[in-house]
Each structure stands twice: as structure tokens, then as C-alpha cells.
Amino acid sequence: MLKEFKEFIARGNVMDLAVGVIVGAAFTAIVNSLVTNIINPLLGIFVGSIDFSNLVFTVGSAHFRYGAFINSVINFLIIAFVVFLLIKLINKLIAKPAEEPEEAVPSQEEKYLQEIVELLKQDKIEH
């Protein structure tokens, strides 16, 4: 069983997934900091509140923390946009350059037609 586990862990795609999860977690921390420390204050200038996470409305004893939801939506949009850009970049790097079409070799019939056209041009010039 230990041997099977080692083989499973040693597979490339499992290691790639592990690295992706770690990098994703670190990236999430960066995005959270960006939203909390830069974007929220900028939006707060226009809305009149600097910290969205404190935005709450209460109905009876229920507290609706819509500010935290706004922060989560902003985080999601930033992460989704960055993932979109990364996928676009990866696809661009993976995509094979478009092969230029080879110049078509004229068929025998096309060669004869070209010769006839040239002869007609010469005949026209001589008359």
C-alpha cells in the first residue's frame, strides 16, 4: 500500500496539482490584500465608506453582512480575470504557429493555359 501511495504521489499530474494549490493559496492572499488595502479604499472614496466588510444591515436579530459579500465578489472577479489571462497566455504559448500554405504547383493544364496567355500577349504586341 505504501508503494502504491508513493507511485500515486510521484505522478506528474499530482505534483502539478499540489504546486497549483499552493500557488493558488498564495495568490489568494495577494488578491485579498489588494482588495482590502487598495481597491476598497478607492471604492470607499466614491461610496463614502472605506471598509466594506463593516457594511451591515439588520432586520430584527438577523445581521446581513453585505460588505463582506462585496469583498468576496471583488476577490472572485480579480482571480477569475487573472486565471483568464493565464489560460490565454498558456494557449498562446502552446498553439502551433499557423503553417504557411505551400505554393501550389501548377498542373500541366495550368501550364498550357499560361503559355497560351503569353503567346496571345506576344501576338497582340506584334500586331
Curated annotation (Swiss-Prot):
It comes from Levilactobacillus brevis (strain ATCC 367 / BCRC 12310 / CIP 105137 / JCM 1170 / LMG 11437 / NCIMB 947 / NCTC 947). Keywords: Cell membrane, Ion channel, Ion transport, Membrane, Transmembrane, Transmembrane helix, Transport. The keyword Ion transport applies. PROSITE patterns: MSCL. This is Large-conductance mechanosensitive channel. The chain crosses the membrane at residues 19-39, 42-62, 67-87. The keyword Membrane applies. Pfam families: MscL. Its main location: membrane. The gene is mscL. GO terms for cellular component: plasma membrane. GO terms for molecular function: mechanosensitive monoatomic ion channel activity. It is a multi-pass membrane protein. InterPro entries: Mechanosensitive_channel_CS, MS_channel, MSC/AndL, MscL_channel. Homopentamer. Channel that opens in response to stretch forces in the membrane lipid bilayer. May participate in the regulation of osmotic pressure changes within the cell. It is found in: Cell membrane. Belongs to the MscL family. SUPFAM superfamilies: Gated mechanosensitive channel.
